Amino acid sequence: MFQNKKQLQYLWIFKPELIDIANRIAEDHTKWMNETHTKEGDKALLMLNWSIGPEFKDGNKTGNMSLILTEVYENQAGIDDHFQQAQNNGAAFRDDFSDFESKCENIVKINTSDIIHSMW
């Protein structure tokens, strides 16, 4: 389905008391993406997913939560456009995004990767 496309994926690990902020960040970013990104052509955003759930380590819940963002683009031009738009007309978050990130236990940011297998 998305084989040979480009993917951006971020993971934030945070304490449960930040869950409302995490949900608002996902909502605000999705709204901005809907207003600014195209569904067609070289820069097409093909898929946007946010997920939230407990963090597990060695099969056990850690007490932390995870927020995962996955964006799939037609090619690298879409990812490049995404970051350019973020700099030029960045998303308006209701919460201080930098403050949220500073309170996270861990953050993993993969700005671009090649999708090597995809189903349905």
Predicted regions and their residues:
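Short, flexible turn/loop "capping" segments at secondary-structure junctions
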Residues: 1-6, 60-63
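Active-site-flanking beta-strand signature of metal-NTP-handling nucleotidyl enzymes
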Residues: 5-15, 68-70
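Short amphipathic alpha-helical segments
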Residues: 18-51, 89-96
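Short amphipathic alpha-helices within nucleic acid-binding modules
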Residues: 20-22, 74-86
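Histidine-centered active-site/metal-ligand motif
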Residues: 29, 82, 117
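Short, glycine- and small/hydrophobic-rich beta-strand elements in well-ordered beta-sheets
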Residues: 33-68, 101-105
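Short, well-ordered, aromatic-rich surface patches in folded extracellular/luminal domains
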Residues: 85, 89, 98-105
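Acidic/histidine-enriched, glycine/proline-rich intrinsically disordered or flexible terminal extensions
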Residues: 102-120
